[in-house]
């Protein structure tokens, strides 16, 4: 397959380099387009009306393109550069840190994959625990081999797969669980501070407020020790409310 590879951790991130190596070993043609620097939390943001520059990055057998933009910018530029031979698949990751629950709303990793499905291309986001329980290469090997087992005919256009590895060794996981997105996630603490000149500023830091997840969701199963697969879609229409409002009179 021709695969467009991206992330939000940046072109030099170990997760991107590791899965690149594994995909190439399996015979795939891999084209990395990733941010010049880390852009975690960028979500679906795009750089409007500002120059986006690209730089070829060579490191041993690795060849990729660094872009001074967001993860979504990287996918857009990548698709433009590959327009004569479009990718069969877009992979975002492997991210350092889980993207489950409401984290998904802020995730540049998931947003990059979602940009792929907006373009009508099958897309997957991979995330591992922030603390490396296993070497990054182990997650990459598992992720690359998992691709062979995914039946993309079961994933309609306009949807992606969001895959997360739990905070235990891959060998100790309970298996793979397909599950729904939780409404839990990171919370953000705001701290008011002052710089060296006494000028006040705000600092946002994330923390996890839960010790267990809402039953049968990605957070729950991840904490239980499962590898989670959650299908997501960019059509955010609330169908039940839509139907109810259609029956409502606004006159």
Curated annotation (Swiss-Prot):
InterPro entries: SurE, SurE-like_Pase/nucleotidase, SurE-like_sf
GO molecular function, one term: nucleotide binding
Cofactor(s) named in the record: a divalent metal cation
UniProt keyword annotations, A-Z: Cytoplasm, Hydrolase, Metal-binding, Nucleotide-binding
Cofactor binding, note field: Binds 1 divalent metal cation per subunit.
Enzyme class per UniProt: hydrolase
Predominant localisation class: cytoplasm
Catalyzed chemical reaction(s): a ribonucleoside 5'-phosphate + H2O = a ribonucleoside + phosphate
EC number(s) stated in the UniProt entry for this protein: 3.1.3.5
Similarity field: Belongs to the SurE nucleotidase family.
Xref: NCBIfam families: surE
Protein name: 5'-nucleotidase SurE
């Amino acid at each position: 397959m021709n695969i467009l590879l991206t992330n939000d951790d940046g072109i030099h991130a170990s997760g991107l380099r590791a899965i690149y190596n594994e995909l190439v070993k399996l015979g795939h043609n891999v084209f990395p387009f990733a941010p010049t620097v880390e852009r975690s939390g960028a979500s679906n943001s795009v750089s409007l009306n500002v120059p986006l520059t690209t730089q070829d990055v060579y490191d041993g057998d690795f060849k990729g393109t660094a872009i001074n933009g967001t993860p979504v910018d990287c996918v857009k530029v990548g698709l433009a550069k590959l327009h004569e031979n479009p990718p069969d698949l877009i992979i975002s990751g492997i991210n350092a840190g889980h993207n489950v629950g409401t984290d998904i709303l802020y995730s540049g990793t998931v947003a990059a994959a979602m940009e792929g499905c907006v373009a009508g291309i099958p897309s997957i986001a991979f995330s591992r625990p922030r603390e490396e329980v296993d070497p990054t290469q182990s997650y990459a090997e598992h992720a690359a081999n998992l691709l062979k087992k995914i039946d993309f005919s079961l994933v309609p256009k306009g949807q992606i797969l969001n895959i997360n590895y739990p905070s235990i060794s891959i060998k100790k996981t309970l298996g793979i669980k397909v599950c729904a997105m939780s409404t839990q996630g990171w919370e953000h603490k705001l701290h008011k501070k002052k710089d060296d000149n006494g000028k006040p500023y705000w600092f946002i830091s994330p923390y996890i407020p839960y010790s267990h997840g809402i039953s049968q969701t990605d957070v729950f199963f991840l904490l239980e020790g499962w590898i989670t697969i959650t299908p997501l879609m960019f059509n955010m229409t609330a169908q039940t409310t839509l139907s109810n409002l259609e029956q409502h009179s606004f006159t």
